[in-house]
Amino acid sequence: MYQQLIKQIKTSDEIIPVNFNISNIDCLLVYSSNIGDIKEFNSYYFPKININNLYQLNNIFPGIVTKDKDPKNIFNDLSKGFIFLFTSPEDYFKFNLPISNNRSIETSVIDPIDLFSSQDGFIEDLDTNIALIRKHLSNQDVFVEYYTLNNVEKNKVALVSLKGYNNYNEEIKSKLNQINNKNVTSINTINKQFQGKHFVPMTLSTSSVQNVSLSIMKGKTAILLDGSPVSSIVPVNLFLFSTMKTDVNTPIYYSFFSRLLVLLFLIISVFLLGFYVALINFHTSSLTIYSLSNLKLTEKGTTLPMFLEISIILMLFELYRYATSRSSSGYIQNIIIFLGGLFIGQNAIKSGLIGPLILLLTSICYLSTFAFTNNLHLITTISLSRIFVISFSYFLGLYGFLISAILIFTYLLSTKSFDKEYFFDGSISLKNKVKEYFTPAEGNNNE
């Protein structure tokens, strides 16, 4: 009776078909031995099944059992822990009984560590992640909408937002509909849909439950993917990538000082080297003789043009960053850092490749990037912007420096994340915008 069906379903050894009989009615049980909880089924559900309720199991066990006739999604459901009970080759019930093999909740590894805030981090189970958000936000206005991607694996996504602010959900779902990947296992696949051709990141990735909760209360939407321990937040702006989750709870003088420094670090990381190159190459008359003599002394022994010196240092820094990020253990990272310390420093200066002042300024610019943000996409964007400013400054002097700065600010001012300005929200007065940034308050919806 079920031979043809078994031949279609049993494509792998872990898929187990079992024929059995209930009051002379032939039935078939199908489950995955690694994912479906057959022990739970045998101990609790199977003893309660008899001829009187065999065709009403979805009413006997509501929420656990569903009735279906479409065999198209059987393979996907088996991989998610469903157990199938066929009463005929055309009719079946599926029991949602996955084996619980989730890892324990741990601290987020991609967000800055803060001992004064919640240490909860997302895991690879969507239901657990939603429960963690609900633990932080018991507000009835928090709205959760589930969505299934239109791909082969039918990956499950949850959109979490605040009622009255979930007007982005339709646009988000239209973006998700365009995903063509057979199996979406990383949140980066979803981020790519929102990125498009933008030069700056259009989503904020975080695995901190508190970060997501605060963002939702500020009117943003969190996108969670089943199987991923990372959430994406939209819409975003430039300064969202530099904020800490405890900024809203710190004294005004502390938040003002820290955000002033963060803003200064952004300016230094992008513009300091370009300004120095323009000044030295074209406008030495603006410097005193004492300053010029000191600069010449620091560059004594170097044979390469300033542009090449800076390029070599930046390439070495990027080399160590990528080498460290691709290493699998702290032991290897320590070796890379040790070797980097040997290569960059006194040995590089003695070799005549670079000067000490250029090395110092380039190091300050590069480190300032990490003081502003830990978002890898934005770090790369800042690095490319720095090279853009240096190139214009090297060939056109201060005119090139000003042109590059104007072009960068023009691009940021014209960029939007959904309907929100990326750099500056024109609907809010400059005075209020500055006040909101430097003195953040919990519940502020405009950041």
Per-region residue spans from a language model:
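Membrane-embedded alpha-helical signal segments
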Residues: 1-271, 275, 279, 286-289, ...
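Hydrophobic alpha-helical transmembrane segments of membrane transport and translocation systems
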Residues: 354-358, 362-447
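Transmembrane alpha-helical segments that form the functional core of multipass membrane systems
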Residues: 237-373, 377-387
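Glycine-centered flexibility sites
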Residues: 81, 117, 121, 219, ...
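Broad structural signal for hydrophobic residues in well-ordered alpha-helices, predominantly aliphatic
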Residues: 5, 172, 319-320, 392
